[in-house]
Structure formats: C-alpha cells, structure tokens
Amino acid sequence: MSNISDITIIGSGAIGLLTAREFVKAGYTVSLIDKSLSGKESSWAGGGILLPLYPWRQPKAISALVIESNKNYSALSNDLFKATQIDPEWYDCGLLICKNPDIELATAWCDQHEIPYKSADSSLFNGLNTQLDNPLWLPNIAQARNPRLLKSLKAYLLSAGVTFIENCAVLDATINNGQINTLITDKGNIDVNQLIICTGAWTAELSKKLLPNDPHSPDISPVKGQMLLFDAKPETLLHMVLDNDHYLIPRRDGKILAGSSVEHTEFDKSTSNESKDKLTCFATELFPALKNSPITHHWAGLRPGTKQGIPYIDKHPEIKNLSI
C-alpha cells in the first residue's frame, strides 16, 4: 500500500483512537490498523468508571495517569461532542465506596491528589442493602459511556482524514537497520515510518509475530470481564456504587451496568450462565430495586493484564521506530 503515514497505529480501541487524535492535533498523518472493527473489543465492553478501583492500593505510576486523565476527560468529551454531535456522555455522578478497611490510606491518597471526598451521608444509601465499613463518597468521580466515546472518536478521526484499515490481520514485519519498514498483513504490505502498538490484551501475541526472538517482549495476558445491563428507569440510581470488587454504574438514560467478573481464560470471551448468575445476585442483593428491571444485555471483554498491574508505555529499546 502506498501513501505512507507519519504514524501507523495497530489497534483502534480507546487507547489507539486517543493516541491517533493527539497526533492529528499535532499535524501528523495517521493510519489505524485493526484485526476487526474499530472499538469493538475491550474498550467497548468496559464500564467507563474514570477511576481505577481503590487507586490507593495501586502502584504509584497508576495514580499519575489517573490524575492527568481526570483533568482532561471533561474537555475531551465536550470537544468531541462539538466536533461530531455524538455525546460520549461524560457524567460526573460521583462514586460511593461502601467498604474501606484502609480508610486512612484512602483519604491520604485523596488529599495528596486533591480528589474531593466526604463521609458518606445516609441519603446516598437509599435503596442499598450492604454492610458498611468506613464508606467514602467521591462526589467528582465521573464516567464515560464507552461505546459512544469510541463512536465519537472514530467520527472525529475520519473527519480529520485518518485512514482506517479494519478487518486486517498483521502477520509479520520486515526489519532493516533496527527499524520496522513494512507490515505484512492479509490485506497486503503496509510501509511504516513510526509504528505504535495499542492492541491491549493481544499485545504480547502480536509482538511475538513481529519480533519472534525479542527479549523485550511485553508480558501481557488477557483478563476476561463479564457485565450485565439492567433496563432501569431514569433516576433509579443516582451515582456509581462500588462494593468490594463489584460495582453498579447508572447511565443518564437510567440503564444500570453491573460488573465485573475477573477470569483468566486466555482469549475466550464467551459469556457464561455462572457469571451471569453471580452478577445478578450481586446487583439485586446490593440494590433490590433491580429485581424489577429486566436484564437486556450480557457481554464479556478481554482487558490487558500485567503482573505488576502497570501498563506498558514506552519506546522499544532496540527498534528505533516502535512504541507501545
């Protein structure tokens, strides 16, 4: 294929699309390659809480990413909506955390990073049924509606002239003088200048195809998460709720997500009745009003997992034009 882009990105989930947007804004030409359709894997499947679960228990590197992204998400959503008329539904509905045995660590983290918090008022627990342990209210924590965010990002990039090469499997690469020159795909060869891999759970698998003997290959594995969607009425639940390792996320239209399972099943993203039953039990016990709301969707996605819980963001130490 001719017309070499300045930047070629493999993977067009949220990270790939957002990376492309930054390069477009800086004046570069960009091509995006995806093995399926843009934004249809883990990014689409996620709940959209704009905070890791219990960030004070996460490595410090995660906090730096969280704080920076929290500063920018509202403006990002507004910019995308103005440009595309597709609303990513950034929604600062707040997050109620029901159990915080490490409350001092939690509030210290919030103080350090200037995240507003309050002791949870009893009104926040209306309709909830759970044992409380130092509950914490984070009123400014927001969410985004992932499918709409992805749709808006893609529309923005298409209008900016970004090339999307979808349903395209990358099979191999040619390397000369410490640089990847060409990607070999099932749709033909694609020459590259700078190459960025944003393939999430599939990154280790792809890296082994491109660089089979690479000692720096990332250690990333898929982690399956299953989710449910309840067709509730608007204002049934007014804020996000985290109870132990599961959560409820109310959308603006009233629908409520319940998630998520954590399963190590390689690249199997099928759903199971067992996980559906567990999530249903969690959701309806925590918030009994959901017993009157039908479950309309049940899905699974594969997010990238690492042993340290820290994402890879770096240039390759030997391949000069490769980043992850």
What do the predicted segments below correspond to?
Residues S5-S31:
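N-terminal Rossmann-like FAD-binding beta1-loop-alpha1 element of flavoenzymes
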Residues I49-N126, L132-D133, T284:
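Dinucleotide-binding Rossmann-like beta1-alpha1 core, especially the glycine-rich loop
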Residues L18, A173-N176, T185-H297, G305:
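Flavin-dependent oxidoreductases
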Residues N146, A289-I324:
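C-terminal catalytic lobe of FAD-dependent flavoproteins
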Residues I15, S38, W202:
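Conserved Rossmann-like nucleotide-cofactor binding loop
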Residues W137-D186, N193-Q194, C198, A204-E205:
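Helical element adjacent to the flavin cofactor pocket in flavoenzyme catalytic cores
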Residues V24-A45:
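Glycine-rich FAD pyrophosphate-binding loop
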Residues Q85-I97, Y117-A160, N181, S261-E266, ...:
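Helix-loop-beta segment of a Rossmann-like dinucleotide-binding subdomain
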